[in-house]
């Protein structure tokens, strides 16, 4: 089966592009907008509309395979590719990628995914968002051409067992970190709430007191609202490097503070994502490793998650091999081709690192549903509920796609 025609269209993603460095520097609020000037190249304002490029591949049999090129909310930060704007990339796709897609055989996924992941135009690799969207569409094309589910294609090509069992799901609240928690508890989410602790003064506190109060409130709220004592969710909070800011990047002081949060969780497992941002990958690995070792020395049960500077497949390998943390976030759009997500999860699982198949609120329903199929095949420890910051909508998309797929897999046993 071959691709007859490739189409690229501009679209909106499910959230916004935010200049992370400007926010860390103290950008103010005006309603939903951030005030002040952007500092990351490519941004025209601190917050601007999220965009995507939809890929449609029309096959010889008339079936249409789809994928969405999307980039993370904090584009251009932490070693990532620059801001992804549709108007800049659609002409490029039509000129350079369309001729390579049309007439291409889609009977196998991996050769096509690897081709575009390694392709260089004018000496440069394709933007991660482009590789992400193309690979989604190519996986869908192979599934449609062969009458298989996308997760079956992944299992077959990696020689993995098809396991018709759910992956734990992680809900993200955005700034709605109180009301959204109630919603998550009502729907029994496995891991919550992300909480978006990306500002010292407003959210963390200059001594960490605001986060401490929030973790206590969070555990109290779960214990008081849950309908059954069997509901014992994991707490996972992303602090965007702010803990390092208030403790002068001292790994011992950072670890002592992180360990002190354990009692506030009242027996619920606690993960702290991105405790520091060292500004580059080698220093980030060293800092996280030092914090992890100190947490172990303290006998703490709190675990830390790598985020910043852990973007590509090779980054994930390096953070894992260093034993730098307890869990890595595999930020799906940052890896480019989705075959890298599979490889990253499998590497973590093989080497004793907990894998969190994450991503961004700034994706689309197409990319989120594709990620469900990838997760069901590769089996990470948890998967992010996405897209958007509304929570309910993302849960609807991800949870329902997972259950539909599991039901179909069960018919094939």
From Swiss-Prot:
Gene3D superfamilies, per the entry: Enolase-like C-terminal domain, Enolase-like, N-terminal domain
InterPro entries referenced in this protein's UniProt entry, alphabetically: Enolase-like_C_sf, Enolase-like_N, Me_Asp_am_lyase, MeAsp_NH4-lyase_C, MeAsp_NH4-lyase_N
Highest taxon of source: Bacteria
Binding site for Mg(2+): 238, 273, 307
UniProt keyword terms in alphabetical order: Lyase, Magnesium, Metal-binding
Site (Transition state stabilizer): 194
Cofactor(s), by name: Mg(2+)
One GO BP annotation of this record: glutamate catabolic process via L-citramalate
Top EC class for this record: lyase
Pathway(s) served: Amino-acid degradation; L-glutamate degradation via mesaconate pathway; acetate and pyruvate from L-glutamate: step 2/4
Catalytic residues (positions): 331
Stretch forming the signal peptide: none
Pfam families for the chain: MAAL_C (PF07476), MAAL_N (PF05034)
Enzyme Commission no: 4.3.1.2
Residue positions binding (2S,3S)-3-methyl-L-aspartate: 172, 329, 360-361
GO molecular function: metal ion binding; methylaspartate ammonia-lyase activity
Reaction(s) catalysed by this chain's protein: (2S,3S)-3-methyl-L-aspartate = mesaconate + NH4(+)
Family: Belongs to the methylaspartate ammonia-lyase family.
Subunit structure: Homodimer.
Protein task: Involved in the methylaspartate cycle. Catalyzes the formation of the alpha,beta-unsaturated bond by the reversible anti elimination of ammonia from L-threo-beta-methylaspartate (L-threo-(2S,3S)-3-methylaspartate) to give mesaconate.
Protein name, as recorded: Methylaspartate ammonia-lyase
Record organism: Citrobacter amalonaticus
